[in-house]
Amino acid sequence: GGISSFIHHQSHYLIDSLRYLTFKRLMKATFADALFYLFAISFGLIFANFMRVKITDLLPDIDMSTFKNTAAIDSVINSFNTLMAIFFIVTVTYFLLLVIFWAVFKGSFWSILMKRSYSMRYVLNYFWLSLLWLGIWTGIFIGSLFLFKDSVIVGVMLLFGFLFLHTSIPVYIVFTKENKIKHALKEGLSIAIGGIHHFLIPYAFIIIFYVGLMVSILFPLLRMATGGFAGIISGLFTIVFLVWCRVYLLEMIAYHAGYQMR
């Protein structure tokens, strides 16, 4: 009946995802994913430190005497305008670098999982898709800060964060298979939105599975680790788990949408 069919499908996704994710493929995909986060976080810290230095240089300590001096006020305003211009340039530069890292490393990640050719044409198309896709979602997140009240903004951000993750996976799966931007957006969103009911149980299973692994594996390891090593273990555990999650969802999408990985 329905229950036996449901159990069969879920076990099918799980078994096939574990069978497909060989040790070599897991290591290569994990390495590509880890490199993205390494570069993204490292450059983020570099730009953040750069802005901290600029703020210190351009905006001196301000006291009440500053507001009694017209020249001092003009100087502060000019410094603030300069700082805003620098902030804009740094933000745009970091966003473009982030898209490049996304195209190079996330593109490599999906090509590894789906056994697709990793070529310059593929990376360039991945870059243009990501520039459009991440640009749209960045605009949505920024716009939300101005459109929603403080009392609901956290919930709205969480909702949009979920929608971003939920729609991104099918979009990039379709793109990696076809290497066509327009088709990836159309078909990927169709799978994500039109077939959202297919994702609900797998999402619940992923959460339960993650909690179970944390309790049975991660927490015991962390109790034996010390200092920064504990952070490294947590990071690698999370990245490896997320690699499996995407293979698991890829198996589910392959079943319902007919997308073959092999």
Describe every region a protein language model picked out.
Residues 2-39, 120-142, 165-214, 251, ...:
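Interfacial aromatic "cap" segments that immediately flank transmembrane helices
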Residues 21, 25, 75, 79-83, ...:
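Membrane-helix interfacial "entry" motifs
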Residues 22, 47-76, 121-153:
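Long, highly hydrophobic alpha-helical transmembrane signal-anchor segments
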Residues 28-105:
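Short, small/hydrophobic-residue-rich motifs at membrane-helix boundaries and re-entrant hairpins
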Residues 40-56, 142-145, 212-224:
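Juxtamembrane "helix exit" motif at the C-terminal ends of alpha-helical transmembrane segments
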Residues 84-112, 133, 137-183, 224-261:
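Selective recognition of hydrophobic, aromatic-rich stretches within alpha-helical transmembrane segments
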Residues 202-207, 219-222, 242:
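Signal peptide-directed secreted proteins
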